[in-house]
């Protein structure tokens, strides 16, 4: 307390004194019943007219007011009371939104983290405090691995500092009570909704969305009726579902028509109750899965692959020399349980061995596999990885790309393709159509979706229903999108089954320890003046081509090359990419680089000691595997994309051969100060900060001015560069859309427009900037001139006279 407050206390102003004390009352010790050090005894001596009870009540109210003012809407002191031994418990739960705050420094943190990863989704995991969120889909995933509702509640209560809020208990019960009651089953390339409870199927068939999507056998031809699944118990079970009083009334009732598609199967060996089902259309699978999740009956997708005698087995096993790491084994344990495979998503950081996880899953299921990637280069890498880690024969692996259209000739095999090849809806060549008929005409045991975050895109999401597969596994390092479609993966693929902790893997040496830094580059006076005058697109070009940023890039390349590092420089802007690379004498790859030249540059970067730096556009975000790279410099990016930032960091995350103490990889993001680029940079870093990475801010690179042959050191050079930038048209500010999802393959996007709308000056209309003024649709102008109805009466008279 300040000296002034002490003097006021001596002057005998009890009300004022009580208010001052309330600001510094026992907030830190709130809830500790044994501590009497902050009892309001001194105030009683000051205010002799108040009783002890009255003073204590006023103190508590004032203290509560101080807490509410400090924490606002996050003040739960009235809702949550601390347990007596709360210091020994590691977490507490927000009663409003289901957030879980975990003390990562607690002795029980490791056990708590394993449990929380199973029942919730990680939101933020820095060094000392972790944040998780309980969602409906995370609880579905928890129940799918065998956890029971009461067990989830009991363990949470054991770990929580406070009693579990009733709202959270009710939410857990509501989300887990109906999970597993309805299954999506694939039989002979036909989809069925299956349940052991006929009343649940009645509920689904009454739904206005699901009901019309079933296949109604009454409208099928006699031939189609004969193909309906049947056995000895079908008729009796069907009667059990649809018959209310008698056979005659059931035939006339509308409920009989509604449930005529419900068919019972034979009793299973481990279940005494009959199983009931109805068939749905292939094209409606996505809609039904989404609707079932909305009405709290999520479809369970499990594959009893060991008892599948219809689909042939694939002869594949891991090689004896192949060893999987503990976190890879843990992720697979979430997928497999009770001899069955579940559909879902596994999230592992770049360089942590996602490919080996997928191959191990394929070796476990031992059925035909289709692997979908983002590019043709990834396709060849997956094929090579299958041959490296497993004992599969080369002729059992087929490749389906623009250049290769192979089929395996055995009963079972592996097909590796791209999302674009499968999702294409345009006219196909004869070979491509024949290959697609092969993919869609058979039943697949396992579909593996690499970089699964691209699936929610409108173009790619159709691949999930185009290919009929028993089990789906999605792999990604960055389960984030900027269009809020990432939640669609929960019903398109399945819930997130496992997400690794990046910092934990780095500490154990499974991935590199990366030092992240943001280098602030001041804008030169000339460039900043033009930046303030230009439009938004040209502004981007100005802050990317900032001479100070160029010098920082040159200095960092020189510094790390002398250390023996291999450096990747990323730029989404192709004009800047070419300008930087040509000025510094380095190789560069962008969307227009031929495939053969790309591979030659990458091989030189990997094996040639004289090639230590390459420049890449966004084509290298996800499609290259360069474990030799130890330093990454980013000079231009795709606005505020969090996913791209993490994917680029992943280019240097693979465990390094150099085991230096401390950091063994470096990530620099060059940002022009006082520009819009700083805003985008802060947005991009959000995902990595949530993973526990810290970004240092570097405002001055010591020794940069003394670098020999420093580019644009004189004002004349900077002015010349500025003139070159200003002479560029707006197209130079475009980002490289060059096949970032088809690195080395033909893009299936629309062909570029023959003309582009652009602003320009009079000199542009006169032929500058390689532009031309062309007037289209001249006949329409003539027609308007002839049309007299649109003219005023005075002008119509003049026009009539002229025509005569």
Curated annotation (Swiss-Prot):
The observed outcome of changing residue 478 to A is:
Inhibits growth when overexpressed, dominant-negative to wild-type in vivo, inhibits transcription in vitro, promoter opening occurs and no longer requires nucleotide, promoter clearance and RNA polymerase elongation do not occur
Q: A GO molecular function for this record?
A: 3'-5' DNA helicase activity
Full protein name:
General transcription and DNA repair factor IIH helicase/translocase subunit XPB
Q: Where is this motif: DEVH box?
A: 450-453
**What SMART domains does the entry give?**
DEXDc, HELICc
Report the principal subcellular site. nucleus
Q: Which reaction does it catalyse?
A: Couples ATP hydrolysis with the unwinding of duplex DNA by translocating in the 3'-5' direction; ATP + H2O = ADP + phosphate + H(+)
Q: Where is the composition biased (Basic and acidic residues)?
A: 236-255, 784-793
């Amino acid at each position: 307390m300040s000296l002034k407050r002490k003097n006021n206390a001596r002057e005998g102003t009890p009300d004022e004194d009580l208010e001052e004390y309330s600001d510094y009352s026992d907030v830190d010790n709130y809830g500790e019943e044994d501590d009497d050090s902050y009892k309001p005894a001194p105030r009683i001596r000051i205010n002799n007219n108040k009783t002890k009870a009255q003073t204590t009540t006023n103190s508590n109210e004032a203290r509560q007011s101080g807490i509410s003012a400090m924490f606002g809407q996050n003040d739960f002191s009235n809702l949550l009371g601390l347990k007596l031994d709360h210091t020994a418990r590691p977490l507490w739960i927000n009663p409003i939104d289901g957030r879980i705050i975990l003390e990562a420094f607690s002795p029980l943190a490791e056990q708590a983290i394993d449990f929380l990863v199973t029942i919730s989704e990680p939101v933020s995991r820095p060094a000392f405090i972790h944040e998780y969120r309980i969602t409906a889909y995370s609880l579905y995933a928890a129940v799918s691995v065998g956890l029971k509702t009461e067990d989830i509640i009991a363990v949470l209560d054991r770990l929580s500092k406070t009693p579990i809020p009733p709202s959270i208990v009710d939410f857990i019960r509501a989300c887990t009570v109906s999970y597993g009651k309805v299954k999506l089953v694939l039989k002979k390339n036909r989809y069925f909704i299956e349940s052991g409870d006929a009343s649940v199927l009645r509920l689904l068939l009454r739904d206005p969305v699901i009901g019309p999507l079933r296949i109604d056998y009454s409208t099928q031809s006699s031939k189609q009726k004969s193909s309906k699944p049947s056995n000895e118990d079908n008729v009796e079970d069907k009667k059990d579902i649809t018959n209310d009083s008698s056979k005659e009334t059931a035939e006339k009732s509308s409920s009989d028509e509604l449930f005529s598609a419900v068919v019972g199967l034979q009793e299973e060996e481990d279940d005494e109750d009959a199983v009931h089902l109805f068939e749905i259309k292939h094209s409606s699978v996505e809609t039904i899965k989404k609707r079932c999740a909305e009405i709290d009956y999520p479809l369970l997708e499990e594959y009893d692959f060991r008892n599948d005698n219809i689909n042939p087995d694939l002869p594949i096993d891991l090689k004896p020399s192949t060893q999987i790491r503990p976190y890879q084994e843990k992720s697979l344990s979430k997928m497999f349980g009770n001899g069955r495979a579940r559909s879902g998503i596994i999230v592992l950081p770049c360089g942590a061995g996602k490919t080996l996880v997928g191959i191990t899953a394929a070796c476990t299921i031992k059925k035909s596999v289709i692997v979908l990637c983002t590019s043709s280069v990834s396709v060849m890498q997956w094929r090579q990885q299958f041959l490296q880690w497993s004992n599969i024969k080369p002729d059992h692996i087929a490749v389906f790309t623009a250049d290769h259209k192979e089929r395996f000739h055995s009963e079972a095999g592996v097909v590796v393709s791209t999302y674009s090849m499968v999702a294409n809806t345009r006219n196909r060549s004869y070979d491509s159509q024949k290959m697609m008929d092969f993919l869609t005409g058979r039943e697949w045991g396992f579909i593996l979706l690499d970089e699964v975050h691209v699936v929610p895109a409108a173009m790619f999401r159709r691949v999930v229903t185009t290919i009929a597969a028993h089990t789906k596994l999605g792999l990604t390092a960055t389960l984030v999108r900027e269009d809020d479609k990432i939640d669609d993966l929960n019903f398109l693929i399945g819930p997130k089954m496992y997400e690794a902790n990046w910092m934990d893997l780095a500490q154990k040496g499974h991935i590199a320890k990366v030092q992240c830094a943001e280098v602030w580059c001041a804008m030169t006076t000339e460039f900043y003046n033009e930046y303030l005058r230009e439009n938004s697109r040209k502004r981007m070009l100005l802050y990317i081509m900032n001479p100070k940023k160029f010098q920082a890039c040159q200095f960092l390349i020189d510094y790390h090359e002398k250390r023996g590092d291999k450096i990747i420089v990323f730029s989404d802007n192709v004009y800047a990419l070419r300008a930087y690379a040509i000025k510094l004498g380095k190789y560069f790859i962008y969307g227009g680089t031929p495939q053969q030249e790309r591979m030659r540059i990458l091989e030189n970067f990997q094996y040639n000691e004289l090639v230590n730096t390459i420049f890449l556009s966004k084509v290298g975000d996800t499609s290259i595997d360069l474990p030799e790279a130890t330093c990454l410099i980013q000079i231009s990016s795709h606005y505020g994309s969090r996913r791209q930032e993490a994917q680029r960091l992943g280019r240097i995350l693979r465990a390094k051969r150099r085991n230096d103490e401390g950091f063994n990889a470096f990530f620099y993001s060059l940002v022009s100060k006082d520009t819009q680029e700083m805003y985008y940079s802060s947005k991009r870093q959000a995902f990595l900060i949530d993973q526990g990475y810290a970004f240092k801010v570097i405002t001055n690179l010591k020794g940069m001015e003394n670098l020999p042959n420093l580019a644009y050191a004189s004002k004349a050079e900077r002015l010349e560069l500025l003139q070159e930038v200003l002479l560029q048209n707006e197209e130079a500010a475009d980002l490289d859309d060059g096949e970032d999802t088809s690195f080395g393959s033909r893009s299936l996007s629309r062909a570029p427009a023959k003309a582009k709308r652009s602003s320009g000056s009079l000199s542009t209309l006169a032929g500058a900037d390689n532009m031309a003024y062309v007037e289209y649709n001249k006949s329409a102008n003539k027609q308007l001139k002839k049309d007299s109805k649109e003219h005023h009466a005075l002008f119509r008279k003049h026009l009539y006279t002229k025509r005569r």
